[in-house]
């Protein structure tokens, strides 16, 4: 039983270096932006609170409080290396290996890293090649033709698997390097989530990471599919049959080897298309709540307006009061309070 650790050895070495890089760069990024972020956030919310209290800005004070709490939560992730490592870096790595295992169809104990998934797929192809090589090597002189055919097929399967696994592994290593760089500068983009004008930077950063994860997972799926195809094609080969051509079997495996790299590049491209549509708006609980409230409010309005009957004046009055309060004309609204106090100061 062949259990190669080629990609795990290479990938783990690179992965350890990238982890050190991520921790160092993320820590340096946090130190660089911490003072600016705290001062800018403090000045922004202080100024907004003062302007709302004197009536220069109209709006509910609760919205400012919620925005301030949201900013503090975001800063807790973006400015603390322990929290960032546990909740962001580890989560991204677990997503990567989890998606790769799921898409590759691995059963039993899941792989600890994406490189172990690659080695598992490579091992399946090489186990088929080893089985064919052993059968061919055990042939006697009277079965030299069958033995030579099995040896040829074993080398073909082993070479085809390596041809597929090699570029796939290289692309995955390159993609992991991109993920490491993005995670290193991630605190800056996570902090950008705190303000609406800069939220688009986080969207693009988050979408690029999800794109890379999907590309790695889809590449693992292609490698697993190619191993399954090799296994089925080799199992269908009967070298002792007088009607089956060894040349045809070799050509079939060669055709699969040519088609699979094209499929690999296509799914890599499709992974980029799928990931580019990811946006932070899709995971915003606030936007979900607003959309739900709007749809529910529209349904309730249609129900009550349809059953109001002759109560038109009462409905209009209630609607007027509702819009009057919703527009900020309440005693806790600074602009409204200033207007009311101004009425008493008239001569």
UniProtKB/Swiss-Prot annotation:
The keyword DNA-binding does not apply. One of its GO terms (biological process) is protein secretion by the type IV secretion system. The keyword Cell inner membrane applies. It is found in: Cell inner membrane. Keywords: Cell inner membrane, Cell membrane, Membrane, Transmembrane, Transmembrane helix, Virulence. GO terms for cellular component: plasma membrane. The chain crosses the membrane at residues 32-52, 61-81, 153-173, 177-197, 205-225, 245-265, 270-290. It comes from the Bacteria. It is a multi-pass membrane protein. Its main location: membrane. Belongs to the TrbL/VirB6 family. This is Type IV secretion system protein VirB6. It comes from Brucella melitensis biotype 1 (strain ATCC 23456 / CCUG 17765 / NCTC 10094 / 16M).
